[in-house]
């Protein structure tokens, strides 16, 4: 392999790896967008001296909550199912919480089971549980009355309500009705949650330290994933404040984080799905938790949002909840009032769709072109190959120029060797003579690397596109070999896991990819080069093997791009070599 080509490839890969690491760890994507002024937060900074304090602490246990005795309340836990055309939600009358939420149009990888969005549920921790007090207070665990209703416009509602009695610090009692009502619209992944606190006579507010109550997300979102084997999946806790999305992927394995910011929404999202809560009034106090529940396979990725103390004897709070795909097409609809059922403008939850960071505009252009190919041939694998072919054709002149520059360098190498030998003890003189020699020969030393470096932004953008594109999830290219472009291909399941490597399948794409890399290295190697420079020989074989292990479990869509791109480069190199011999 030619020295300049090797240097360019190595430099490209180092820059590529460094770019991925730095972007994910230190510079998560932030979106600057114009936004309407936000309203004052719920019960923000109450100053009334008439607030009855139930406890000065944010913590409150269920032993401090007394259910108002009534024979009409249920005596045992029951579950209720609400279904629309796209979701199936299971509720419990214990707290009025969600214990299962399945997406009917999306299957789990390698299974016909529908994606379960509520994971790690326990008796103490359910989705959209409400706790009186702060994030560390126990969720309300009382049995609620239930009312279900199907409205004439197709919406479905389920409500939970219960009278509750609390002891105040001054010895008095606070009695109120706690109600939660959910409203679902057909064809929409977003629904409404209304929380009502209706105080009885004599109620003078609700305060546990600096919170009235705390609402929580699911303990973990689905689909279930293996953190060790699926390195391309992730969980990120995010919120939107000061016209920016702020993201944190570090809340794992027991870590927690308190956040005090004025946020218009907060979410937990993965590569393909999101759980988002959008309150009517901005959130002021949040808490992120990555604790691991006993018996759970994976740590939680959970957020808590606290409401400010309630003044007076009643409060009504409204939340929109989105539990569904992180598809840019769907999430974008909440940026235009005419495109969604709730009149949202510029909500910017589309910022949760995975992208290439600062290269996102370039990624969108590539996505647009690929979607045109898909309309012509409705197969995402074929559309991917056609986009790769188009990019290789566009960059062929640059590839040819790089090869010609490398050949010219080989022709000048004898004279360069002479200069290096002549001035080996005088580096400054050698540099001056080399500059003079290149100028007289009409050769630019950067001409071999520069054309390859120009292609790097497109390479990064295509990497991000093929690794994260939502439509690849569940999209088949070749049935029996590549049934899902979002996961690795498979021609044989081992039935066990290979230690250290964590391989469970025999995959063909990584083998083809590595073979194409080796062939390309041999094709670009000049006669006798490996004998003259043994490090080149190591590079020819080491780099492909290194990437074989690195990409073995990569999504097949991503690896299909790399492999087909290598094959096209091989063909182009044959054409270039033939033209340069003439």
Swiss-Prot record:
Q: Give GO terms for biological process.
A: protein insertion into membrane; protein transport
Q: Which CDD domains is this protein grouped with?
A: 5TM_YidC_Alb3, EcYidC-like_peri
Which residue ranges traverse the bilayer? 4-24, 376-396, 446-466, 542-562
> Cross-referenced InterPro entries, in alphabetical order?
Membr_insert_YidC, Membr_insert_YidC_N, YidC/ALB3/OXA1/COX18, YidC/Oxa/ALB_C, YidC_ALB_C, YidC_periplasmic_sf
Compartments reported by the entry: Cell inner membrane
How is this protein positioned relative to the membrane? Multi-pass membrane protein
Which controlled-vocabulary keywords does the entry list? Cell inner membrane, Cell membrane, Chaperone, Membrane, Protein transport, Transmembrane, Transmembrane helix, Transport
Gene Ontology terms, MF aspect: membrane insertase activity
Q: Which residues form a coiled coil?
A: none
Name the protein family: Belongs to the OXA1/ALB3/YidC family. Type 1 subfamily.
Self-association state and partner proteins as the record states: Interacts with the Sec translocase complex via SecD. Specifically interacts with transmembrane segments of nascent integral membrane proteins during membrane integration.
Q: Which purpose does this protein serve, as stated in its record?
A: Required for the insertion and/or proper folding and/or complex formation of integral membrane proteins into the membrane. Involved in integration of membrane proteins that insert both dependently and independently of the Sec translocase complex, as well as at least some lipoproteins. Aids folding of multispanning membrane proteins.
Q: What is this protein called?
A: Membrane protein insertase YidC
> Encoded by which gene?
yidC
